[in-house]
Each structure stands twice: as C-alpha cells, then as structure tokens.
Amino acid sequence: MGKEPLTLKSIQVAVEELYPNKARALTLAQHSRAPSPRLRSRLFSKALKGDHRCGETETPKSCSEVAGCKAAMRHQGKIPEELSLDDRARTQKKWGRGKWEPEPSSKPPREATLEERHARGEKHLGVEIEKTSGEIIRCEKCKRERELQQSLERERLSLGTSELDMGKGPMYDVEKLVRTRSCRRSPEANPASGEEGWKGDSHRSSPRNPTQELRRPSKSMDKKEDRGPEDQESHAQGAAKAKKDLVEVLPVTEEGLREVKKDTRPMSRSKHGGWLLREHQAGFEKLRRTRGEEKEAEKEKKPCMSGGRRMTLRDDQPAKLEKEPKTRPEENKPERPSGRKPRPMGIIAANVEKHYETGRVIGDGNFAVVKECRHRETRQAYAMKIIDKSRLKGKEDMVDSEILIIQSLSHPNIVKLHEVYETDMEIYLILEYVQGGDLFDAIIESVKFPEPDAALMIMDLCKALVHMHDKSIVHRDLKPENLLVQRNEDKSTTLKLADFGLAKHVVRPIFTVCGTPTYVAPEILSEKGYGLEVDMWAAGVILYILLCGFPPFRSPERDQDELFNIIQLGHFEFLPPYWDNISDAAKDLVSRLLVVDPKKRYTAHQVLQHPWIETAGKTNTVKRQKQVSPSSEGHFRSQHKRVVEQVS
C-alpha cells in the first residue's frame, strides 16, 4: 500500500480481499454482548485520537450495539478490516447525505431521534459524532431508568387490579377509575417519594373528604389508558364481581331505586363501590342515606317535574301516591272540591218518553229546545228543556252547573226544577211550566207598561235577585226573554226568573265576557273583573224598557262596537215625549241602576227599599196611565222591533 494513509476504507477493502466471507460475521458481531462502560470509553477515545469520523459510520440502534461492533473488530485483531469498514461507511455516508443533508451546526435532540428511529427500525444516519463516553453512559442510564419505570408501572397496575379484586378503595365510577390510572405522576417527578406518593393517591386509602375525592377523577377524563386489553378485561371483571357482591349485601330500598332513576351519575359512584372494604359497608350505607335525604330535601324545595323522570311503574308508585291529586285528577273528580264539580244528584238514566209526552216548541236557544210536556200518569204540565250533547263540545260543566244552581234555589219568583233525565245523546230538564210566556212577548204586545205594573215586575225580579245574591249566585243573562210572566187568577201577573245557563257562584272577580249586548254591563266589557252587580245593571235596562218601550243604549247604525262604547261611557237620556209622563221617582231609580261604577250602583236590597217600589207595592190599585194614541203605539212597536233585531 506504500505511503497511503491508513483509513477505515482501506482497512475495509483489505479485509474484504483477505476474508470475503467475514462480512456477515462482522455484522452479526454487532448483536454480541456489550462490554463494560470502561472498555467502551477506551474504544471511542481511540477512535477520536485516530481522527476517523465515527458518526459517519453505520450507527447502531443503541450504545451497546456500538460497543459490540468495536469489540467484534478488536476481537478479530485485523487492521485491514478497519480500513475496509471505513470505506464502506463513507460510501453509505455519501448516499445518506443525499437524503438527510443535516446542517453541520445543528444537533437534533438525542432522545427523541433515537426513540423515533428505533420504533421505525431505521438506521441512524447523520447523527453528530462528537459524543463523549459520558454521553454514552448517560444514555445507558436513561435506558435503565426507563426499564425501572416500566417495571414499577407494571407492579402498580397489577397492585391496582388486585385491589379491585379484593374489594378495596373508595366509591369511584369504574370508567373514571380506569382512566385515572394513566395520569399518575412518574417516579422522575417525585423519585424520593415514588411509592409513598402512590399510596397517598391510591384508592386504598379512605378519603377524609368524600366530596373532594369524588371530584378527582373528572380531571383525567381526557387521558388515555396505558394498560393492555388483558389488564382492562381483568379490571372490568373484578369490578363487576365486587359490584355483584355489594348488591347482594346491601339492602335496596325504594328511596335508593328512585335516586338511581333520577340521578344516574351520583348513584353510579355509590353503586359501583364494589371495591369498598367489607368492614366499611356500614359507613357507605350511612353516606348513601345522607345523599338520599339531601335529594328528598331538594325535591321538597323544588316543584315536582314528573315529565322529566324516567321510572318504572314499581319505582314510581310511592311518588304517585303522594302526588295523586296533582298528577291524576280525573280519578278523584267526585271527591275533589277544587276541581270539576261533582255531577248533580237525582239524574235519571232512562228514556224520558216513557214518563212524559211532548208537545209544541215554546222556546229555543243555542244548545237547547224547550217544549211543552205532560206527565203520563198525573197529567201535570211541564216545560221540557232538551239539551243536545253534541252541541256542547266540552261544555258539559255548564249544564251540570245550571242543574246544581237551580236545585239550590227555591223561591216563588224562580222557576223550579222537577226532574232530570239523561241519555247518551241528550239531557232533559223537566221545569215548572209558566203559561203566560216571557216578558219579551208581553212587551211586544203592550209596548210599554204603566208605572205600577213595571214597579211590580221589577219588585218580583229584585226579590229573586236578593235570594240569588244572598247565595253569591250571579245570573249574568238577565233579559226579558228569561223572565216568564205568570198570569194569576186575580188577573195579576208574577215574574219568574228562568234559564240559569250562565249563572255562576261568585267567589272572586269574574273576567269572562258573556251576556246579551243590549243588557251587558260596562265592567264586563272592560274586562277588569265583575261580580253580582252586573245583574243590577241589566235590571236597570229592563226597567227602562218597561217604562218607555225601547232600550237606553242604542246604536243608530246598529254597530255592536259603537254600542259597546256607548255602554262603557254610560250616557243615556230620558227622551221626550216618551218620558214626559214618567214620574221623577221612576227616573231616579233608573238613574241609580244605570251607573258605570258598580260600587255606586244600587243593589237588589236597595231597589226593594226605594220609595217608588214601596209605593207601587202598597197602591197596587192605582189608576193606569192614560193610553197613548194608536199611531204612537205603532211607532213604539216598530222601534221595539228594531231593538229586538239588535238583540238577536
């Protein structure tokens, strides 16, 4: 070779020429046993003194492999091998730089590069060569520390699984406990108290503050489990077994069942307490009872929302028994005073035609038709009010209310109820029959009435209202059509109040807008709440019509909205010549009834004490007023017909 410098390439070429079959032996020698750190230090120091670039050689996967390669070459004792090896390494370096091209001054992170390439099984090309023996030793220390850490983790995982199988640890959710294992601190962070810190954070120690301990697993919900599938399977089996044992030991109460249904997450923590020690089960029951009492206290503070609960029928029965009147009112309707009123007593479920024979129609309405009828045995005449159920459309309570109110009233000036029949399609009210017709027909016939007759009629009406109002019952539909005229044998007349379809017990202000437009009170239209006073307003309108033949509030254009505005204003006049012959006492009573403010309006008792009513009662034989001419009577009749059209 002459004076050529001794290089690794020349040694490699010489070795290949002399020992063509020894290349594989050199490669295999890399996996031999690693020598001591002292020997490796000498090898690398020698290489640095010889000024050959060790980093440009084929770098082994670990420090032990590098030392093994050098030891194999020294064991052979052939310098030409080193020359040929140097040439081979330089050839690979040229090819490798085409791929990697690392900067001369850059030094990639040692641990990250080694671990990443070791995982991919690649050879580490382009690593800096200026590594001292101290760095190699530290790499070996890191490897040993990692192995020690992995062994400690395996021991901890096995210890945790054994804890679960033994039934140890506080109340934790199974899934949260599994996820917590991956986020514990490594021994590097706390090397001095590695095992001691594990005991402090372990699930064997019973927590002083259960609330804080229960909140810990939530911090590690996003962590991943490092254990293998076998460890997870064994952990799940152990937890399931412990849970089964706990369920068999602990009694399951109805309160516990309801708590499981309402709040799954808190109960899952307590129900999955299968890794509790057996001797601590009593404390667990006490804690669960405390949680149950807190739940019950919260339920008492908050309104019950049964719609959001998901319970079985068995679990829900106690709650339904406690909340029965609120959740299922339809079963206790007859017994509940605050809900729908009970059905009236004495309703006969039979065919009414077997007992009564019907005659002509004497009246009709929105829901009913009134016919004459006669009892088949006694031959007594009655009025049969036939109510069609199909027209009620859920307003059956109105009929029941009417029946109950009529049954509660007993007065000479109120129509009496005799019997009630009911079938699947209709309801039959057998009422007192008044032969004289209603007051509306009487007004059409007579146009107007003398003051004594009008006073007697208002007296009869107010007597009926006194009886009703004393029972806090408001009629709400007073009008001439609902006042029946009974003609007595002495040629006198008596008014009887009928049709209690809109009657109602007044216990608080009513806001329902109802009635007939001509007779409706202003407080009903204002929708500010009303009471018994609306009947007295209607009585004032009826008195006005009885004295002059037309209503006090009229719309020239027959516009209902305009009529309602006039009623709410309360302006009316005693128009001449119709009121020229009417006494001031009669006008005074009308003025005291047609008052917009219901508090200032006359009551039924005050009407009966008015001088005009008292005088009419005492002097029933006062001369009738002078009859008006036929032409004026025809004028009043046509005007009253227009009023009737407005009412209809």
Curated annotation (Swiss-Prot):
Binding site for ATP: 362-370, 385
PROSITE patterns the record matches: PROTEIN_KINASE_ATP (PS00107), PROTEIN_KINASE_DOM (PS50011), PROTEIN_KINASE_ST (PS00108)
UniProt key word Thylakoid: no
Main localization, broad class: cytoplasm
Assigned EC number: 2.7.11.1
BP-aspect Gene Ontology terms: protein localization to nucleus
PANTHER family named in the record: SERINE/THREONINE-PROTEIN KINASE
Entry protein name: Serine/threonine-protein kinase DCLK3
Gene this protein is translated from: DCLK3
